[in-house]
Amino acid sequence: MPKNKGKGGKNRKRGKNEADDDKRELVFKEDGQEYAQVTRMLGNGRCEAICVDGTKRLCHIRGKMHKKVWIAAGDIVLVGLRDYQDDKADVILKYMNDEARLLKAYGELPDTVRLNEGVDVDGPEEGEGDSDYIQFEDEDIDKI
């Protein structure tokens, strides 16, 4: 068998984990692009997202982001609209949590978009009846 003369394996090719993108410039949408919130992941590099204009689109994650940038339900993404297919789009960029908060503060995202959708931080809102907490009055306690 020939002797190994290489300079390492796949760990060398992977390189050091340098945090270059921790402070990146905020990218705003251009014409032909739209902000969207991922509703669910479909697999095979696809996801379903609801755009800011109210349209539900099937989004394709581009190859540059595939297996490098992990997208989950509830994430805010920038999608490129297709001029020949209105119900499909391509994911261009995933916004980090702080970038999404900045977009909402700048007024780019409407108030109806809920950030951190998977996490209910402040509990159920007024009017939601799916709570397990029941509050009794003093006279109700005496009857029990």
From Swiss-Prot:
Residues 1-25, 120-144 are annotated as: Disordered. GO terms for molecular function: RNA binding; translation initiation factor activity. CDD domains: S1_IF1A. Pfam families: eIF-1a (PF01176). GO terms for biological process: translational initiation. Residues 16-25 have a biased composition (Basic and acidic residues). Residues 1-15 have a biased composition (Basic residues). PROSITE patterns: IF1A, S1_IF1_TYPE. GO terms for cellular component: cytoplasm. Keywords: Initiation factor, Protein biosynthesis. Residues 22-96 form the S1-like domain. NCBIfam families: eIF-1A. Belongs to the eIF-1A family. Seems to be required for maximal rate of protein biosynthesis. Enhances ribosome dissociation into subunits and stabilizes the binding of the initiator Met-tRNA(I) to 40 S ribosomal subunits. This is Eukaryotic translation initiation factor 1A. It comes from Triticum aestivum. The lineage of its organism: Eukaryota, Viridiplantae, Streptophyta, Embryophyta, Tracheophyta.
